[in-house]
C-alpha cells in the first residue's frame, strides 16, 4: 500500500507550492455571549473540512497552540486575529484566515477573510448565512476549495461540548466536556481520541484502551481519516508499530498535504529500518514545508542508511544553507561521509563543526574527528586530535577528563594502559561527588577484564561498581555483575537473566545483557536468534552495535551471505565517548569485513581489513582469538 500511495502521488501533475493556511478563531459580533463557543467551532470545522483539499494544508489548532510554552500562554477564547496570529506564523502558515460572525433573529451569518501574512494583502473573501454553524462553516470552506470533506458530526450539542473541552482551563473540565460530546454523538471520533490521550497521560492505560475500543466499534460511521487516526492512536498505545504504520499510510493517502502525518510516517519507517520509504516520506513532507530544517536533516540520514549518499549530501547542503551559523549541519555531513567510508571528509567536517561551535554536543565533534582518523588506521594522527579534545575538556575543568583519556587508550589499542588509567580514576572518585562515575568506571573495567579473559578480576570490579551505584549507573552495574557470573549454558544464562531482570520494563536491558553473556561464552547460535529479534526492532541510528554483532553471529554460524550487508556502513561515533560494550563490535567490524571479503574471493580487501583490525586491537588480544586468526590470514 505504501508504494501504491507514492505511485499515486507521482502521477499527479506538478502544481503550485502547497498553501499552508491557518484558520483562526472567529470573533463574535453578535449581542449574546452564549454564542461565543462558535468562534472556535468555525475554526475547527473549516480546518477539518479542508484537511484533504488538494493544494492546501489546513493547520490544526492543536499544532498552532503547540508552541504556547515557548511563546507564552494565549487567551484561547479570545478572537484569533489577536490571540493566534503569531502562533499561525510560528506554525509556518503562508495564509491566515480570520473571521467574524453574528446571530440575529435566529439566523447565523459569518465572513472569512484570508490574507497573505507577508504582504498583508487580502487574497480571498467569503461569506455565508444559514441556520446553524455547520451549514455556514461548510459554505465558507467550499468557497476556499471545491473539494471539502464532511465534518465528523452534525450534532450541535456534541460540537458545543467538544469546543468547550478544547477551551477548558482544567483537565477535569476538559474530561467532563468530552464525556458530554461523546454522549451527544457516539459516532463523533475526536472526543474519544482526546479523552484517551488524557487517560494515557494519567497512566490509566485500561481506560484509554477501553475508550479507543469503543470508538473503533463505531468507526464505520466515521469519516475515513478519523478511523485512521483512531487506529493509529490504538496502535501506538499497544506499541504495535506495524499497525501504526498502516494507519499512517492510510491517513497520508487521505490527507496528503499534512506534514505531521508524513513526519510520523517517516519516523515509523526509520524505526523499522525501511529507509527508502522514509526518504519518500521526508520528501513528501518537504513538498509541504520546503524550509523544514529538521526534515532535511533527517532526510540526509535516511538517504545515507538507504545507500543514496548523493541524495543525503544534497539534503544536508540544503539544511546547511538554511542554518549557516549552526554546527549541526556540518556534524550531520560528517556523519553521512563517515557512514559512506569517506573518513577524511568526515574528519574535516567534524573539525569544522567543532570550530564553528566548540560547545556543540558538549564538544563531541573533536572526539568524532579523532574517531574518523582512527578508523582510517592513522593512530598517531588520531592521537593528536584526541589530545585536542581532552585538552579542551581539561581547560573547561571537566572532572572526568581522565575517564575520557582511559576510553581513548582502550579504543586506540592500548588496552592494558586503559585499564590502569581507568582504575586510578575510579579509586580517586569513590568518595566524592564523582561516586557514580567511579561506579561506571568499575563496571567498564569489569567488562574489559571479561573480554581480556580475567573473569575473577571482573567479578571483583563489578562488585565495586554495584556498591557505588546510583540512579544513573545502576543499569551498567547490574549488567556488569550479571556478565561476571560463572560460565553457564545458554538456558542457564536465560534463567539468570529472568531472575535479575523480572520486570517487563527491563526487557531491553535484560536482552542485551543476555546477548553479551552468550557472546562471551561463544554461544553464537542462541545469541543470533536474540540479536535478530533486537535488530528487527531498532534503527541503525539507535544502536550501531546491533548489525555488527548480528553479522558476527551469522558468520560464526555459516551465514556469511546474510552477514555482508550488515557490515556495509561504518558506525557513527557517539559524542559521549566509548560505549561500555564497545569491545563487542569495535574494532571487530574490520575483522568481520575481512572474513566476508575472504569468503567472497577478495584477498586484497580481506588483508586490508585484517591489518586494520590488528592495528586497532593493539598488543593485547581478546578472548575470542580473532587477532591471531587475522595475523595468520594476512
State where each predicted segment sits:
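Residue-level recognition of tetratricopeptide repeat
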Residues: 166, 197, 233, 267, ...
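Helix-start (N-cap) detector for alpha-helical repeat units in TPR-like alpha-solenoids
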Residues: 158, 189-190, 223-225, 259-260, ...
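Alpha-helical segment of the N-proximal tetratricopeptide repeat
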Residues: 156-184, 194, 227-250, 254-260, ...
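Register position in tetratricopeptide repeats
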Residues: 194, 201, 237, 271-272, ...
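Solenoid-like repeat scaffolds
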Residues: 179, 183-184, 216-221, 249-255, ...
Amino acid at each position: 500500500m505504501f508504494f501504491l500511495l507514492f505511485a499515486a502521488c507521482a502521477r499527479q501533475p506538478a502544481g503550485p507550492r502547497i498553501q499552508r493556511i491557518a484558520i483562526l478563531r472567529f470573533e463574535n459580533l453578535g449581542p449574546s455571549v452564549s454564542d461565543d463557543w462558535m468562534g472556535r467551532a468555525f475554526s475547527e470545522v473549516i480546518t477539518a473540512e479542508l484537511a484533504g483539499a488538494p493544494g492546501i494544508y489546513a493547520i490544526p489548532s492543536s499544532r498552532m497552540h503547540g508552541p504556547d510554552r515557548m511563546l507564552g500562554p494565549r487567551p484561547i477564547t479570545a478572537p484569533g486575529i489577536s490571540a493566534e496570529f503569531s502562533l499561525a506564523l510560528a506554525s509556518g502558515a503562508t495564509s491566515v484566515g480570520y473571521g467574524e460572525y453574528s446571530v440575529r433573529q435566529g439566523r447565523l451569518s459569518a465572513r472569512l477573510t484570508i490574507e497573505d501574512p507577508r504582504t498583508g494583502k487580502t487574497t480571498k473573501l467569503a461569506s455565508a448565512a444559514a441556520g446553524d454553524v455547520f451549514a455556514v462553516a461548510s459554505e465558507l470552506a467550499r468557497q476556499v476549495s471545491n473539494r471539502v470533506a464532511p465534518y465528523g458530526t452534525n450534532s450541535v450539542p456534541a460540537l458545543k461540548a467538544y469546543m468547550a473541552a478544547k477551551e477548558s482551563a482544567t483537565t477535569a473540565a476538559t474530561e467532563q466536556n468530552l464525556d458530554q460530546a461523546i454522549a451527544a454523538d457516539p459516532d463523533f471520533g475526536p472526543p474519544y481520541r482526546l479523552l484517551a490521550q488524557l487517560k494515557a497521560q494519567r497512566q490509566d492505560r485500561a481506560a484509554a484502551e477501553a475508550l479507543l475500543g469503543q470508538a473503533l466499534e463505531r468507526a464505520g460511521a466515521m469519516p475515513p481519516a478519523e478511523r485512521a487516526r483512531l487506529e493509529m492512536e490504538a496502535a501506538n498505545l499497544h506499541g504495535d508499530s506495524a499497525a501504526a504504520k498502516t494507519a499512517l499510510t492510510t491517513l497520508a493517502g487521505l490527507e496528503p498535504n499534512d506534514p505531521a502525518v508524513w513526519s510520523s510516517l517517516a519516523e515509523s519507517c526509520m524505526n523499522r529500518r525501511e529507509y527508502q520509504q522514509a526518504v519518500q516520506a521526508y520528501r513528501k513532507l518537504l513538498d509541504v514545508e520546503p524550509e523544514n530544517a529538521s526534515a532535511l536533516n533527517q532526510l540526509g540520514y535516511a538517504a545515507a542508511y538507504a545507500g543514496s549518499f548523493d541524495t543525503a549530501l544534497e539534503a544536508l547542503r540544503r539544511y546547511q544553507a538554511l542554518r549557516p551559523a549552526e554546527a549541526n549541519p556540518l556534524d550531520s555531513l560528517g556523519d553521512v561521509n563517515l557512514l559512506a567510508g569517506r573518513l577524511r571528509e568526515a574528519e574535516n567536517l567534524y573539525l569544522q563543526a567543532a570550530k564553528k561551535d566548540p560547545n556543540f554536543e558538549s564538544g563531541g565533534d573533536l572526539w568524532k574527528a579523532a574517531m574518523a582518523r582512527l578508523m582510517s588506521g592513522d593512530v598517531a594522527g588520531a592521537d593528536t586530535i584526541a589530545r585536542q579534545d581532552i585538552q579542551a575538556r581539561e581547560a573547561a575543568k571537566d572532572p572526568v577528563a581522565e575517564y575520557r583519556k582511559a576510553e581513548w587508550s582502550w579504543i586506540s589499542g592500548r588496552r592494558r594502559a586503559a585499564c590502569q588509567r581507568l582504575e586510578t580514576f575510579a579509586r580517586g572518585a569513590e568518595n566524592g561527588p564523582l561516586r557514580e562515575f567511579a561506579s561506571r568506571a568499575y563496571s567498564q573495567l569489569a567488562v574489559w577484564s571479561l573480554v581480556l579473559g580475567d573473569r575473577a578480576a571482573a567479578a571483583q570490579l563489578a562488585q565495586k561498581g554495584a556498591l557505588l551505584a546510583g540512579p544513573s549507573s545502576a543499569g551498567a552495574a547490574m549488567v556488569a555483575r550479571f556478565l561476571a557470573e560463572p560460565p553457564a549454558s545458554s538456558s542457564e544464562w536465560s534463567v539468570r537473566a529472568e531472575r535479575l531482570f523480572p520486570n517487563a520494563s527491563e526487557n531491553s536491558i535484560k536482552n542485551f545483557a543476555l546477548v553479551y553473556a552468550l557472546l562471551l561464552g561463544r554461544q553464537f547460535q542462541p545469541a543470533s536468534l536474540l540479536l535478530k529479534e533486537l535488530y528487527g526492532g531498532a534503527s541503525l541510528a539507535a544502536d550501531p552495535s546491533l548489525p555488527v554483532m548480528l553479522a558476527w553471529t551469522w558468520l560464526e554460524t555459516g551465514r556469511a551471505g546474510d552477514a555482508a550487508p550488515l557490515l556495509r556502513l561504518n558506525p557513527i561515533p557517539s559524542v559521549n565517548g566509548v560505549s561500555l560494550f564497545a569491545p563487542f563490535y569495535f574494532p571487530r567490524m574490520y575483522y568481520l569485513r575481512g572474513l566476508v571479503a575472504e569468503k567472497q574471493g577478495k584477498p586484497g580487501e580481506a588483508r586490508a581489513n585484517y591489518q586494520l583490525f590488528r592495528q586497532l586491537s593493539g598488543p593485547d588480544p581478546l578472548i575470542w582469538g580473532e587477532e591471531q586468526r587475522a595475523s595468520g590470514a594476512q
